Swiss-Prot record:
A GO BP entry: chromosome segregation
Organism: Escherichia coli O1:K1 / APEC
A molecular-function term among this protein's GO annotations: calcium ion binding
Protein's recorded name: Chromosome partition protein MukF
Superkingdom field: Bacteria
Length: 440
């Protein structure tokens, strides 16, 4: 997030000195949200004490609280929010008793978290990324032009620090809010499945698909602009390499690169985690259906029998011929009728016979390594054999070669516990992982 210039002890001492504290029970938080909502409808952003009392009255009615002490409780709530720096109070000698109230940055931040930031908008994210791209391009152009220290502060450092970094923080906040929404969706799905999983399947599917779509939309938007943003950051970084006095710009660019990498990386990781959860839910539903279908059928049958006299029913069944009534014996009996007698050159040779012949040949050829005590590199040997056979036979031939090779001896490197390197054995992507056999 944003960079802090103070140390932890300084911040702790500062908070203790100013007696900062926030206490917002659900009714007070609702009051603050009501104030923020009504305040957003006003052009001047100001509210009188009477308007605050009216807002408190709506909240009090919603919580079914007594109306006899509305004035006192509203006054206490307003004073408490002023004390907690959620509201600013402005009084005037000309209008004594008619104070004006405005939300503080803290109050706006809290209400934004609960109201405005909850809504994900691809258009908003696209606009933010468009603004960032424009700012980065102008900063990169200014960096390549070069200039004095004022030029670097004004045209490079300032846009990066006060525009690009803040928008990156806003995007990061959006991702963190999406994390909370995912957790809320998981809780909703758990509650639905615990109540009645059969009725909840459609609702679960809707929640899963909506969340997956939102995450994918967010990530696609980020990835589409990510390369261009990184390219402009690299341009600025290249321009600062020849200046020893621009460490502050170089450090800021490095921080922005780290933020952008973290944002894009977490977006993809969040999608992967959600896909795993999606599969877990579907597996649970399938398991529940498999376990429950027999019980449900028995229950419905029992209920139908019990209510037969009130709701009579008829059972109709059909005994159709089997569509797949074919057996190996029947095929063998009809084999001669279909194929007739074949010449000896076209007689079918079973694969087992071919395998035995091939294994004997390979065993005889590999025995040379044992006789001469020459190390046997499986990767090279298998590749040499596969080059002599068509692609369709590669798997079977490779298995035979490996089976015969491991009978000759072992690799001393196997006892080190270190994995062997993967070696390609054909031109189609097949690989083998094995140490060189050197002990027969």
């Amino acid at each position: 997030m944003s960079e802090f210039s103070q140390t932890v002890p300084e911040l702790v001492a500062w908070a203790r000195k100013n007696d900062f504290s926030i206490s917002l029970p659900v009714d007070r938080l609702s009051f603050l949200l009501a104030v923020a909502t009504l305040n957003g409808e006003r052009l001047d952003g100001e509210m009188s004490e009477g308007e605050l009392v009216d807002a408190f009255r709506h909240v009090s009615d919603a919580f079914e609280q007594t109306s006899e002490t509305i004035g006192v409780r509203a006054n206490n709530a307003i004073n408490d929010m002023v004390r907690q720096r959620l509201l600013n109070r402005f009084t005037s000698e000309q209008a004594e008793g008619n104070a004006i109230y405005r939300l503080t940055p803290l109050g706006i931040g809290i209400t934004d978290y609960y109201i405005r930031q909850r809504e994900f908008s691809t258009l908003r994210l696209s606009m933010q990324l468009s603004i960032v791209a424009g700012e980065l391009k102008r900063a990169a152009d200014a960096a390549e032009e070069g200039g004095d220290e004022f030029h670097w502060h004004r045209n490079v450092y300032a846009p990066l620090k006060y525009s690009v970094a803040e928008i990156f923080d806003s995007i990061d906040l959006t991702q963190r809010l999406m994390d909370e929404q995912q957790q809320q969706v998981k809780d909703d799905i758990a509650q639905l499945l615990n109540k009645d999983w059969r009725a909840a399947i459609s609702s679960c599917e809707l929640l899963l698909s909506e969340t997956s779509g939102t995450l994918r939309e967010l990530q696609d938007t980020l990835e589409a602009a990510g390369d261009k943003l990184q390219a402009n950051l690299l341009r600025i970084q290249d321009a600062t390499m020849t200046h020893d006095d621009l460490h502050f710009v170089d450090r800021l660019v490095f921080d922005l690169q780290s933020k952008l990498d973290r944002i894009i990386s977490w977006g993809q990781q969040s999608i992967d985690l959600w896909i795993g959860y999606d599969r877990h839910v579907h597996k649970f539903i399938r398991t529940a259906i498999d376990m429950d279908k027999n019980r449900v059928f028995a229950q419905r049958l029992r209920q139908s029998v019990q209510t037969y006299f009130d709701e009579p029913w008829a059972l109709t069944y059909a005994n159709a011929d089997r569509l797949l009534d074919m057996r190996d014996e029947e095929m063998v009996l009809r084999d001669e009728e279909v194929t007739g007698e074949l010449p000896e050159d076209l007689e079918y040779e079973e694969f087992n016979e071919i395998r035995e012949q091939l294994a004997a040949i390979i065993e005889e050829q590999l025995a040379v390594y044992k006789t001469r005590q020459v190390p046997l590199d499986l990767g090279l040997v298998v590749r040499e054999y596969l080059s002599q056979y068509p692609r369709a036979r590669h798997f079977d031939v490779a298995r035979i070669v490996i089976d015969q090779a491991v009978r000759l001896g072992v690799a001393q490197a196997d006892f080190t516990g270190l994995p062997a390197k993967w070696q390609p054995i054909n031109d189609y992507g097949a690989k083998v992982q094995a140490h060189v056999i050197d002990k027969y």
